Amino acid sequence: NWNQGLRYGGGTGNDLHGMNYLLAHMGVYYRSTELQDNGYTYDYLSPDLLSAEGVYFDEETQTIELAGYKALVIYQDWLDADGAAKILEWAKQGLKVVVLEGAAQLTLFNDGRDEELAQIMAELTALDTVRVAEIYDASEDFNYFDGVAEGYSDGVLEALQELGVTPYTQYIEPNHQLLGQTRMDDAGNYYLYLYNYC
């Protein structure tokens, strides 16, 4: 676990196993680094954000505003039914969505809405604006949130490209050294921030 930093027991010499996580080219929550390697920037967000005041889907730009998100990637095994319904509503209006296989199968807590979620997800994944991406390196009983060395290779990048979703700034070839974030100010100016891993 590269987040751990120091091995249990601490100490000096061979007992010290510190690692700067900023130098590790690894996914933390979403495991694949293929999106960032190809210039895509992303954030982790709660489905509750989609219903927050001032957040809307802009049909003209085909983005979630005010953040400018061009697509959503759903990779967690849980998703609340209200969030799924909002995603379905926007996907019908043109929002691009990629669902990683095995994602959005359960609702939070024990709210009794798993069947409702399943119906929403079945309708969502049938839309032309939605793709289901396969995990290429997962065993049969793979759980995305178990601490196993699987789930790092998937079809999300290909699905986004098939949907026509491109990064605001992209590299000529995959880059394992730079991590970028793009922001736009009120005047419509884009800013690209790059972090160099090396």
Residue ranges of predicted features:
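Carbohydrate-binding surfaces of carbohydrate-active enzymes
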Residues: 1-198
